[in-house]
Amino acid sequence: MAWDKSAFDRKVGELAQPWLRRALLAFFVVVTAALVYSATQLKVDAGFNKMVPLEHEYMRTFTEYQKTFGGANRVLVALRVKGADGDIYTPEFMRALKSATDDVFFIPGVDRATVTSLFTPNVRFIEVIEEGFAGGNVVPASFRGTPADLEIVRQNVLKSGNVGRLVANDFRGALIRAELLEADPASGKRLNYRAVANQLEAVRGKYQSDRIDVHIIGFAKAVGDITDGAIGVLAFFALAFVITTILLYVYKRSLPLTALALVAALMPVVWLLGLLPILGYGIDPMSILVPFLIFSIGVSHAVQMTNVWTQETQLGHDGQTAALNAFLKLFIPGSVALICNALGFLVIMHIKIDVVRELGITASLGVALMILTNKILLPVMLSYLPATPGPVQPVADRFDPVWRAISAFAEPRFAVVALLVATLFLGIGSWKARDLKTGDLGKGIPELHDDSRYNRDNLAIVDSFSIGVDVLSVIVQTKDVQGACTDFAIMDTIDRFEFYMRNVHGVQSVLALPGVAKVISSGWNEGSLKWRALSRNPDVLAQSVTPVDTATGLLNTDCSAMQVLVFTRDHQGTTIAHIVKEVKKFASTNNTPQIEFKLASGNVGVMAATNEAVDAAEVTMLLALFGAITLLCLLTFRSWEAVLCIILPLMLVSILCNALMATLGIGLKVSTLPVIALGVGVGVDYGIYLYEQIKHHMEDQGESLREAYYQALRDRGTAAVFTAVTMGIGVGTWAFSALKFQADMGILLAFMFVVNMLGAIFVLPALAAFLVGPRARAGAGRDAGPTHAG
C-alpha cells in the first residue's frame, strides 16, 4: 500500500494544537536544562588502545607478546648539549641526566621495569680482559662526577654498544627510555595521558637551560600536545558561530529568525554533549570536531526551514499556519537527508578502530537528535512569530536572474556542456587520485604541524640517534624446538633476516639476538673478529646466548619467541608498506614448521595495522555509504532516475576529494578517511532538497523539467548556496588551527561542502535532462521555458 501524504498532512494538522505546542516547548526546555548539567561532567578521553585496530592480525601478535616484550606505548626523553662544543661527559650533564631519569621513573603510569638510561642498572657492559670477562653497570655505583669517573663512563659506554641507542652518535646527547602502562596502577583507571604529558613537560621545564636542550617524544606526549591544541578548537567554534550569525542576519534581515535558526542549530550540540557522559563516553581529541560538524549541519537545515516559513508568510499565511506548512513540506525530505547524514557517519564504524567507531556513534547520534530539534522544535518556535518578523526581503527575487540562467542546464543542449565538464573533471580527478597514499606522508606525527615542538623534538632525536620512537618489532616464534636459542638453523635464519632487513630502504638499524650473540662469541675469543659468527656447536652457541638477559627484550624466558627490532627512518605510509612487504617476502620463503616470522609489534607495527585497516575499509565504506543512500532515495522518490541524479554528483565529488588529498600531500588515514563519508552524508542534502522540489513541481503542478528546476532553485537553491558557503567558511577557518589534522579536515570539508553544492546545482539537472526529461516531455507533451513565479 502506497504512503498517503495527504492523510499524513491532515493528521499533523489535527495535532497542531496550542496545548501540544506548549507541551513540546516545556519538554525541550526541561530536557535541555538536564543535558546542560550533564555536559558539565564531560571529560577528555584518550587512550592508546582506542587508536589501534585491535582485531587486526598484527595487533593480535602485539597483544599476545605485549607483556613479554613490551608494547608500542613508549616515551623517549633526550637531553642534548647546546652549542657547537662539548659532550655529555661533564658533571653538570650527568647530574641532569641522573635526576631526569629519577623524575621519569616516578611519573605515575610509567612501567618502572622498562625505564632505561645510562643510570639504570639494566644498562651494563661486558669486556674481555686477560683473566676472562669483566663487566658491570655503565655508570658505576661509585660515580661522583670526577674527571676519572667521567672517563670510566666514557669507556664503558663504548664497551656497552649503546652509542646510537642511549648515547647520541656524536656523544652530545643521551636518552631516557620508558614504556607506559594502559592503566594507572594507583587508581586502576585508564591512564590520563594529558597528565603524563604535563609531567613530562615539567621535566623539560626543570632541565632545559642555556647549556642543555630537552626533547620529548612518544604517544603520551603526542596526545598531550594534541589535547592542548584541541582546546583551541573552542576558539574556532566561537569564530564560526560569529561568522554564521553575521551571515545569517545578512541573509535573513531578521533578528528573530536568525536567533531561532541558531538556537535550533546549537540545541543538538548541547544535547549530544549532555548525552555522552550518560552513555559512558568522553570526548576524544580526534573527535572533538564533531560538535562543530553537527552545528554546521544544523544551520543548513535551520536555514531551509526558516526559508520556507518566510515564503509561506509572503503568501499571506499567519505565523502558525506558515510554520505548519513549513513542517509539512520539509519534514519528510529533511528527515531523509538527516538519515543519510547519519548513515554517512555510521558507515565509518566499519573501520575497526575504537576512536573511529566513537566518532561514528557521536556524530550519528547528533544528527538523529537534529530530527527532533530542527524538524519539530524549530517549527514550534516559528509558530509563535508574527507573520512579519522584520523587514524580510524575498531573497529568491534577488537571485532570480541567476536561477533563470542556471535552469537552462535542465535542457539537453546546455546539459551536454555541464556533463562534458563533469566528465573532464572526472578524468582529471581519477588520474590524480591514483597518487593518493595510505598513512602518514610527512615526518613526525601528522596531527601536528611540521614546526610544532613535538615534531622538532622528533627530528632532533632521529638525527642524533640510530634509533627513535619508530620501531617495527617482528616476533620469531618457534614450534616444537627445545632451546631454540642454541639451535644453529633457527639462529642462522634469524641472522639472515637481520642482515636482509638492514639492507631494506627506510630501515635505520636492526637489533636481534644473533647479532648480539656474535659479539659475545668474539668476546669469548679475545675479541677476534674471526669469531664474530654463530657456532654450529650448541654448547658454544649457548655460551654466546646465556649472557643476554630477557630484560633486553630480544628473547623470552624459554627462548620459544625472539624479537627482532627494526628501527625505521620515519613512519611515512609508503616507508611502512615497503618494509612490511619485505618482511612478508622473507617470511614467505623462510617460514617452516619449526619457525615463523610474525608481524608485528612496536609503534610502526601498530601503524602498519592501522594503515591496512584503513586501506581495507575505504572501498567497503564507500560502497556501504552509497548503497544505503541509494536505498533511501529509492524508497523516498520511487525512481531510479532520481537515485542516479542524486548519487552520481556525490560520487564525482568523492573522486575529486581523493585527488585534492593527493595534490595537497594528505594521506588516507584514521583522521581523513571519515571526511569523505561526512562530506557525502552532508552533501546529499542539496540533491534531496532540490530533487524533491523538482518532483513536486513536475508531478503536482504539471510543469516542464526546466520550469520545475527553476522553481526548485527559487525555493531551495538560495538556501543551499548560503549554507554551503557558510559551512565552507566556517570549516575553512580550521586551516589556521594549531592541529594539522584539523587544518586538513577543514580544507577537505570546505571543499566537499561547496563542490557538492555545485554538483547538485549544475550536474543534477544535466543528468535529469536526459534521465527524467524525455519521460516528462512524453507525458506532458511540452517543454516550456521558465516564467517568473510571483
Label the predicted regions:
Residues 1-46, 380, 393-443, 456-459, ...:
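Signature of alpha-helical transmembrane segments and their immediate interfacial
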Residues 228-283, 350-354, 621-665, 736:
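Interfacial segments of transmembrane alpha-helices in multi-pass membrane proteins
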Residues 312-339, 698-722:
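Helix-loop junctions and hydrophobic alpha-helical segments within the transmembrane domains
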Residues 409-410, 414-538:
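Juxtamembrane segments of multi-pass membrane proteins
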